[in-house]
Amino acid sequence: MTDTGREGLQNREEGFELPLMSLREVVMFPRSIVPLFVGREASIKAIESAISDYGKKIFLVAQREPELEKPGPEDLFEVGTVSKILQLLRLPDGTIKVLFEGLYRARWDGTADAIIGADDAYPRVRVTRIEQESSEDDDEALVRATHEALDEYGKINKKLAQETLVAISALSDAARLADAIMPHLKVDYRRKQELLEVESGAERLEKVYELLQGEIAVASLEKRIKSRVKNQMERNQREYYLNEQIKAIHKEMGREDDPQAEVNELEARLAEKSMPEEAREKALREMKKLRQMPPSSAEYTVVRNYVDWILDLPWNTLKETEIDIDNARSILDADHYGLEKPKERILEYLAVQKLVNRLKGPILCLVGPPGVGKTSLAKSVAKATGREFVRLSLGGVRDEAEIRGHRRTYVGALPGKIIQSLKRVKHNNPLFCLDEIDKMSTDFRGDPSSALLEVLDPEQNSTFNDHYLDMDYDLSQVFFITTANSLHSIPLPLQDRMEIIRLPGYLETEKRRIAHDFLLPKQVEAHGLAASNLRISDNAVLEIIRSYTREAGVRNLEREIASVCRKAAMQVVEAGDKEKTLTVSRQNLGNFLGVKKYRHGEREDTSQVGVCTGLAWTEMGGELLVVETALMPGSGRVEITGKLGDVMTESAKAALSYLRSRSDLFGLRPDFHKEIDIHVHVPEGATPKDGPSAGITLATSMVSALLGIPVRNDVAMTGEITLRGRVLPIGGLREKLLAAHRGQIGKVLVPRENEKDLKEVPGEILKGLEIVFVDHVDEVLPQALMAQAESIFGGRTQSTPLYAKLRKDAQDGGATMPTAQ
């Protein structure tokens, strides 16, 4: 210890230096002896320094916030207690047990400047002793009243040792009496700190007396409660003893099956179960019925099953969920390749739920063709949010009772599938995937889609009423995700309750990536092969996609890869060499999968009159659609074949009406159609086709046939036509452009209003295509027909019919005329 420090210990006015140790939720009072466990490194260093350099004296002060591990000067109170270390015991875990004796109050500045040696392992501060005011004569009444209150408190609180009471009763000084009583009162450490800072002994004792009176009131109440509980327990024990005697009597009489025991068990379960008051009251009423029924009656079993259902449901049981956006994004990316927009929308939804901390919001509906990952995406969302995953298939459901349950009046009645699933998962906040919601149907038993209106309405599903339960059940904590292949069969009111997220079909590039990264490793492992046993080239995978599957998803692609793996496994086993390596290329793919199953539309080999290439959208993706028009002598009949739907048939009629209305523009007589028959055919006649987007394709094919001008075979088009020749926007542009790219089309004519949709088309597809935006058929024909634009629309004189001139242009092939590629 320094000389300055020794002088400081004797100079109370100027203050003296001591090590400081902060306490958590403990306030040290003068003349009190308290054992403390010390584990913080700075506190241990302060104690060691106090023993070696400061005569075992240390300054103990309480923290304002006990959670802080390393409190700063501003985190400590200014008033503490100079204490002496009486005993120290080091424990095996590195902590120490120290016995402190409080000596007197002291104060420090409570600022960073007051700390001496701020860089040391423990703080040292300069403290000033707080002098104690002397007691006055009129304090005697307060001291006597406090002694009486302490005696009363000691009679109620048996935890207070008799020796402690005797020692305290010998004190007559107000200040010392207050300091002696305070450590034994159950009050918050902040309240104790307030009393420590009171310098007047009489004032401090008065506050202690008030606290003592409050503790007496609380202790008296606790005593009454304990007495009441004890009496209740004695009464319960007496009832238990009598019930056991009754059981023993039944056993002696050979009646071991006591029906009341079963009801008692149900009542015990009910007492432990957390549930709404309505459900509890209903269960109690049903149990009263059970007590009055003979177990052999049929009604007894019905009531017993009903009570079991009430007790088994997770009314208020919620599973801990955690929404971590980064983790959710990682899970979605790991489980699904592509699908960026759907995944982004799901992450946005989860982010909102994390901020508002409630689930009330839109119900998500994932719409897309089969095999694109709708159900597995819902499963990944459950995994990302930590919820139980429940899948309920609605395909073929036609009975409303499947959703709402049967009324108890029916034999074998049960709750609906939703309540049954909640009982199975034992939590009230799972993720519910209502699969194939578009496959429900209606019959005389009701409309299940109407029952779902309540389930999928965030404003109503907190009071979902199942017919079997016949009471409200809260579904607002359930995360609902529905899936569908199409929205056409979903009623509009049900659609209105859901937020639609569309999952488009995969592009070929995405399928190829999915095959290499997900499907191939999965199937290789499933078939017992090593990764080195089988190698499939990119071209082979692309050939499988194009020639052996026709789908928007990847289910059939996985089946074909599994077939390749089976063939490979057979060859490895037959060769008897587990290290054998098989390479599948485009050339030998047929050895594994046989002949090709499908052919995708490709462009025509040559440019022909009346043959025009259009673009179509199907659930399996985009396709090239060839339209053929033939003319023959006749009486004006129009024949349309190829299994076309009503909309496509009407598009053909609209295209023909447009041509007739502008016959003079093309150099045709107004009554040209009366002398010929027009036959429009769309090949692959067994395949149904419909939709308005083939309008300009039909019109171009007819113009080509009427004028005898070939249509360029490297041009494809899509767009709806009006009677005025306007070109209207279409859907599925992404898939249609993929089909054009795959079919080696060079130029695609697209409605101008679809220009905004190009943002969703991958750049690798656009790179090989020339996209031309059109507003009118007048812009389509010069791009598609093998003649100059002036040749089609330039001549209007009757002396030189355009029909003959354009045919001559097409046959001669002028230098400025586009050539077919």
Swiss-Prot record:
Molecular-function annotations in GO: ATP binding; ATP hydrolysis activity; ATP-dependent peptidase activity; sequence-specific DNA binding; serine-type endopeptidase activity
Supply the induction statement. Answer: By heat shock.
Write out the catalytic residues in the record.
S693, K736
Q: Which positions in this protein are listed as binding ATP?
A: G368, P369, P370, G371, V372, G373, K374, T375
Please give the InterPro entries that the UniProt record associates with this protein.
AAA+_ATPase (IPR003593), ATPase_AAA_core (IPR003959), Lon_bac (IPR027543), Lon_bac/euk-typ (IPR004815), Lon_lid (IPR054594), Lon_proteolytic (IPR008269), Lon_Prtase (IPR027065), Lon_prtase_N (IPR003111)
From the UniProt record, list the reaction(s) this protein catalyses: Hydrolysis of proteins in presence of ATP
Q: Name one Pfam family in it.
A: LON_substr_bdg
Keywords, in A-Z order: ATP-binding, Cytoplasm, Hydrolase, Nucleotide-binding, Protease, Serine protease, Stress response
Highest taxon above the source species: Bacteria
Q: Where is the signal peptide?
A: none
Task: List, for all copies, the residue spans of the domain called Lon N-terminal.
Answer: 18-216
* GO biological process terms on file: cellular response to heat; protein quality control for misfolded or incompletely synthesized proteins
Q: What EC number(s) has UniProt assigned to this enzyme?
A: 3.4.21.53
- HAMAP family, from UniProt? lon_bact
**Family, per entry:** Belongs to the peptidase S16 family.
Q: What is this protein called?
A: Lon protease
Q: Which organism is it from?
A: Nitratidesulfovibrio vulgaris (strain ATCC 29579 / DSM 644 / CCUG 34227 / NCIMB 8303 / VKM B-1760 / Hildenborough) (Desulfovibrio vulgaris)
